[in-house]
């Protein structure tokens, strides 16, 4: 009489607590996950790269806009001097920050960001000029720029030609146009703004205490 065959379960396929899948089975899901992760990764966009570049290029502007301690390192006399000229305002780092905050409220912060980028560019070492000039041009001057500045066609075209053989002065023409625009348009409004007047009044009140 033939003994009945006993069917034994395949342990490596059981979902039990003590046995895991075979090495071959355990490796396959990991490859699948890796493939899924690769598919989910998206290439960095130029816009994101440019934002990172702008933050690294003028970090004090962004940090200053968010700072709540400006009153601790400013005097009323210093802030009053900002009303003498745009030049005096921009010569002061905290002045740049406060003016930048005002421009941001008017959605025109690209003007001071470009001006600061040009100031930084002039201090650039010769072997780095080409790379930095290209970044500034693409960020502010190009017709599809992330933060396109308001300059005339001639200045835009002239700047485009100059960056092909970059020098420390290749953005000077465009920078002067933006400076004149801020001086004539934004700066007078800034001096009448709550951002400036409240800061000045608070500092003057603290002086009298």
From Swiss-Prot:
Its main location: membrane. GO terms for cellular component: cytoplasmic side of plasma membrane; cytosol. One of its GO terms (molecular function) is G-protein alpha-subunit binding. SUPFAM superfamilies: Regulator of G-protein signaling, RGS (SSF48097). Keywords: Cell membrane, Cytoplasm, GTPase activation, Membrane, Signal transduction inhibitor. GO terms for biological process: G protein-coupled receptor signaling pathway; leukotriene signaling pathway; negative regulation of signal transduction; positive regulation of GTPase activity; response to bacterium; signal transduction. PANTHER family: REGULATOR OF G PROTEIN SIGNALING, REGULATOR OF G-PROTEIN SIGNALING 1. Regulates G protein-coupled receptor signaling cascades, including signaling downstream of the N-formylpeptide chemoattractant receptors and leukotriene receptors. Inhibits B cell chemotaxis toward CXCL12. Inhibits signal transduction by increasing the GTPase activity of G protein alpha subunits, thereby driving them into their inactive GDP-bound form. This is Regulator of G-protein signaling 1. It comes from Rattus norvegicus.
């Amino acid at each position: 009489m033939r003994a009945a065959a006993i069917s034994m379960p395949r342990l490596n396929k059981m979902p039990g607590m003590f046995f895991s899948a075979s090495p071959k089975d355990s490796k396959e899901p990991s490859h699948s996950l890796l493939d899924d992760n690769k598919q989910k990764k998206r290439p960095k966009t130029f816009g994101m790269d440019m934002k990172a570049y702008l933050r690294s290029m003028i970090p004090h502007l962004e940090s200053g806009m968010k700072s709540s301690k400006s009153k601790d390192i400013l005097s009323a006399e210093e802030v009053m001097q900002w009303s003498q000229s745009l030049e005096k305002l921009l010569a002061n780092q905290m002045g740049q920050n406060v003016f930048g905050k005002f421009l941001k409220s008017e959605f025109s912060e690209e003007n001071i960001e470009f001006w600061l980028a040009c100031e930084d560019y002039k201090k650039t070492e010769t072997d780095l000029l080409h790379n930095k000039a290209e970044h500034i041009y693409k960020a502010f001057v190009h017709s599809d720029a992330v933060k396109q500045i308001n300059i005339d066609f001639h200045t835009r075209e002239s700047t485009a030609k100059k960056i092909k053989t970059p020098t420390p002065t290749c953005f000077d023409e465009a920078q002067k146009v933006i400076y004149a625009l801020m001086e004539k348009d934004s700066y007078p409004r800034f001096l009448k703004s709550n951002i400036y007047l409240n800061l000045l009044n608070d500092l003057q009140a603290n002086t009298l205490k």
